[in-house]
C-alpha cells in the first residue's frame, strides 16, 4: 500500500493505535495532537488522507477541516467523534468529509475505509 495519512486527535492512545494499524498496512503516517500541528503537517508533508477527531481543544474539527481543504482541495478526510455532535458531523459532510466513525470505533472498519479511499487514488 502507498499513501500518506495524517492522524489528528488530542488523545495520545488513539493516535498511537491508528499509527500502528496504518503503518502495518504500509502507509506513511503522521500524527498531530492539535490543529496547528495538523496544518503544519498538511503544508509540509502533503498527506493524501486525514483521519480527524471532531472534538479537539483549541481549533475544533470543523476549523481544521476547512483549513486543510484551503491548503489542499483534494485532501480526503474521515471523521472520528466520541460525542453525538450531529451538527458538526453534518457540517463536515456538507463540506466534503467522506465518512464518520463514532468512538469507540471498530478498527477493522476504519482500516478498510482508509484502504478503500486510498485505493481509489492509486
From Swiss-Prot:
It is an enzyme of class 2 (transferase). Pfam families: Response_reg. Residues 4-118 form the Response regulatory domain. SMART domains: REC. Its EC number is 2.7.-.-. Binds 1 Mg(2+) ion per subunit. It is found in: Cytoplasm. The modification 4-aspartylphosphate is found at residue 53. GO terms for biological process: phosphorelay signal transduction system; sporulation resulting in formation of a cellular spore. PROSITE patterns: RESPONSE_REGULATORY. Its cofactor is Mg(2+). Mg(2+) binds at residues 9-10, 53, 55. Keywords: Cytoplasm, Kinase, Magnesium, Metal-binding, Phosphoprotein, Sporulation, Transferase, Two-component regulatory system. GO terms for molecular function: kinase activity; metal ion binding. The keyword Magnesium applies. Its main location: cytoplasm. Key element in the phosphorelay regulating sporulation initiation. Phosphorylation of spo0B during sporulation initiation. This is Sporulation initiation phosphotransferase F.
Amino acid at each position: 500500500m502507498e499513501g500518506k495519512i495524517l492522524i489528528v486527535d488530542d488523545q495520545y492512545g488513539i493516535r498511537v493505535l491508528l499509527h500502528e494499524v496504518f503503518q502495518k498496512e504500509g502507509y506513511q503516517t503522521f500524527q498531530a495532537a492539535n490543529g496547528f500541528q495538523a496544518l503544519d503537517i498538511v503544508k509540509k508533508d502533503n498527506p493524501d488522507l486525514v483521519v480527524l477527531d471532531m472534538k479537539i481543544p483549541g481549533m475544533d474539527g470543523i476549523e481544521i477541516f476547512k483549513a486543510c481543504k484551503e491548503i489542499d482541495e483534494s485532501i480526503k478526510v474521515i471523521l472520528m467523534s466520541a460525542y453525538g455532535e450531529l451538527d458538526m458531523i453534518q457540517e463536515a459532510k456538507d463540506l466534503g468529509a467522506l465518512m464518520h466513525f463514532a468512538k469507540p470505533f471498530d478498527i477493522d472498519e476504519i482500516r478498510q475505509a482508509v484502504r478503500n479511499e486510498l485505493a481509489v487514488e492509486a
